[in-house]
Amino acid sequence: MLNTLLTHLINPLAYIVPVLLAVAFLTLLERKVLGYMQLRKGPNIVGPYGLLQPIADGVKLFIKEPIRPSTASPTLFLVTPMLALTLAMTLWAPMPMPHPIIDLNLGVLFILALSSLAVYSILGSGWASNSKYALIGALRAVAQTISYEVSLGLILRSIIIFWGGYTVQTFNTTQEALWLLLPACPLAAMWYISTLAETNRAPFDLTEGESELAPGFNVEYAGGPFALLFLAEYANILLMNTLSAILFLGASHMPAIPELTTINLMTKAALLSVVFLWVRASYPRFRYDQLMHLVWKNFLPLTLALVLWHTALPIAFAGLPPQL
């Protein structure tokens, strides 16, 4: 009984609570970074240096009255934000930090499959709102996410050829001698840009378009359901950056000081997340046709060529003697 309680309740909570705390402070960091890049302070009133601002925001959102449009689908309208957050939390299960909560043989495919399911929560929330603005925003979001998942899948295919397995832990063994960032530099650049688009971040934030007159699929949401969608979005940002660090930025295991494994991975993921915020502060929004042109006419041919190259190269050199 105690063992079941530990594995089914305490272990998942030990993952979920720190992720949600990290999400809360990522929002504060984003507002601070944007503030300083626009020559102002950012939040600095609530608590010392504004550190309690995310908690105040969370409490404010969850005690607001949940307004549901009278014409909206009652069940789907509330289920889709919960689905979005559930998927965002489940995605962390196979991540080696340094040990995964579930040890899957096909961890990479699990992450790819579940991140694809997030499309349904976006489409469902846009459709259930029964608003033309929400539906148009949802359709744009779905088209963008599906398009960039193609390039993400092909880039992962190439990296899997590099490390020779679908288990996320095998990256440690592969990258002990050399970070994959160096031999797979074009892949890393395309992967990072694709994760920006996949998580609907600037300059690819056409789905939300906060500065526009009507934002995207979440236009009808307020209070608690909006907070759930918001948490899911930022949890996905942290997940994608942690995955980028795992794939390209070397083994998190340090043989000399094994205690620093988690800190090593967290530092790399945090630095990649800060670059996400820098990009948001620096670049204007893409036009929709440019967004699609980038993935279908630039990334897709290049990733296909690299998949063929990485498949053919080991076979071509297999006949050479090892001492060469």
Curated annotation (Swiss-Prot):
Transmembrane in keyword set: yes
Top-rank EC class of the record's enzyme: translocase
Annotated transmembrane regions: 9-29, 76-96, 106-126, 146-166, 177-197, 228-248, 259-279, 299-319
Membrane topology: Multi-pass membrane protein
InterPro entries (alphabetical): NADH_UbQ_OxRdtase_su1/FPO, NADH_UbQ_OxRdtase_su1_CS
One Gene Ontology MF term: NADH dehydrogenase (ubiquinone) activity
Keywords, comma-separated and alphabetical: Electron transport, Membrane, Mitochondrion, Mitochondrion inner membrane, NAD, Respiratory chain, Translocase, Transmembrane, Transmembrane helix, Transport, Ubiquinone
EC number: 7.1.1.2
Record localization: Mitochondrion inner membrane
Disulfide bonds: none
Keyword Translocase annotated: yes
GO biological process: aerobic respiration
Catalytic activity: a ubiquinone + NADH + 5 H(+)(in) = a ubiquinol + NAD(+) + 4 H(+)(out)
Gene Ontology cellular component annotations, sorted alphabetically: mitochondrial inner membrane
Source taxon at top rank: Eukaryota
Function description: Core subunit of the mitochondrial membrane respiratory chain NADH dehydrogenase (Complex I) that is believed to belong to the minimal assembly required for catalysis. Complex I functions in the transfer of electrons from NADH to the respiratory chain. The immediate electron acceptor for the enzyme is believed to be ubiquinone.
Homology family: Belongs to the complex I subunit 1 family.
Protein name listed in UniProt: NADH-ubiquinone oxidoreductase chain 1
Gene designation: MT-ND1
